[in-house]
């Protein structure tokens, strides 16, 4: 399997070690929408790659991760807005479940993650 390329993650493989680096140092590696999805894709690649035996997760720059990107969080209300309150809450619930699934990809990964 070839090493994937991402916009918010730097991924490279050295032997049996896959190094996945959060790569938004100008934003203290805050998790934006693209990074959430790329984290899931990167750890699915690690899990499926027969040549990877362990994954190393790190952050570029002086901070590992600042948490959720506040700009993304501010847009959640617009993203989930609906005139029907119940539908709005359901959209929000589905978004939260999707974000949780992205981070759960580390737990689902059959290879050790450091």
PLM region spans:
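Conserved CoA-thioester-binding segment of acyl-CoA-metabolizing enzymes
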Residues: 1-60, 86, 90, 97, ...
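Short amphipathic alpha-helical segments
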Residues: 33, 69-70
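An acidic, glycine-rich surface segment that forms the CoA-thioester-binding/catalytic face
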Residues: 40, 44, 70-114
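Short, active-site-adjacent cap segments at secondary-structure transitions
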Residues: 61-66
């Amino acid at each position: 399997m070839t090493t994937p390329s991402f916009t918010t993650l730097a991924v490279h493989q050295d032997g049996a070690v896959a190094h996945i680096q959060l790569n938004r140092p100008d934003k203290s590696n805050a998790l934006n929408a693209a990074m959430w999805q790329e984290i899931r894709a990167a750890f699915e690649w690690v899990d499926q790659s027969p040549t990877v035996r362990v994954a190393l997760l790190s952050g570029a720059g002086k901070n590992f991760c600042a948490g959720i990107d506040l700009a993304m969080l501010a847009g959640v209300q617009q993203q989930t807005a609906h005139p029907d309150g119940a539908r709005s809450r359901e959209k929000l619930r589905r978004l939260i479940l999707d974000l949780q699934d992205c981070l759960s990809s580390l737990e689902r990964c059959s290879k050790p993650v450091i």
